[in-house]
Amino acid sequence: MIEDVKCAVRSLQANASEYNLDPNRIGAMGVSAGGHLVSLLGTSDATDGWDVGEYLDQSSRVRAVIAMAPVTDLSRSFPNADIEAMKHVGFGEDNVAAASPITHVTSDDPPFLLIHGDRDRLVPYEQSQLMYGRLVQMNVPAQLVIVKNADHSFTAPNGTATPTLAEINQIILDFLAKYLK
């Protein structure tokens, strides 16, 4: 799947003038499994072997990553049985590290915005905390927003999420304005 995401970015790069895009201002955003994929997109490079398919003369690197409720370290245990099964069946023991964005972080990665609910029972918010710590350790610009009282879908089953969805949207817009200017 990451191969398809990387090919999509290369396609945007190759067709930027046709789509009226600035190829130097392409970012990626994903939620849950999409958060995992954009995190892997932001941390992987051509040496990982995932740049296959069309537009190989183009870069699959993005300039900013927004990952919401992402899985970042598959070596950790998950309370959700489906994620645990996917780790072993979908990736296999040998590929767990390779499929973990946290293992690919280098100092030349794009800026990251990580957003995670503190009541997420599907993907523990520690996944974003660990990724944030690794990014900071490697001097990658990173921002972590833990949404209080929010579950995996950023809703608040018991009260109000803080920051609110409107505030989260503004945080995202500010991040994009800063890094995709």
Language model features: what each stretch is:
Residues 1-25, 131-141, 147:
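Serine-hydrolase-like catalytic core of hydrolytic proteins
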Residues 4-7, 11, 36, 40, ...:
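Extracytoplasmic/secreted proteins, especially bacterial periplasmic and envelope-associated proteins
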Residues 7-80, 96:
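Primarily recognizes the serine-hydrolase "nucleophile elbow" in alpha/beta-hydrolase
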Residues 23-25, 61-64, 109-112, 138-143:
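Loop/turn elements at helix/coil->beta-strand transitions in domains of secreted/extracellular proteins
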Residues 70-104, 110, 137:
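Mobile cap/lid helix-loop segments that gate and shape the active-site cleft of serine hydrolases
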Residues 73-74, 119-123:
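Acidic catalytic loop of the alpha/beta-hydrolase fold
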Residues 108, 113-116, 120:
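Short beta-strand/loop motif that positions the catalytic acidic residue
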Residues 129-181:
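C-terminal catalytic histidine-bearing segment of alpha/beta-hydrolase fold enzymes
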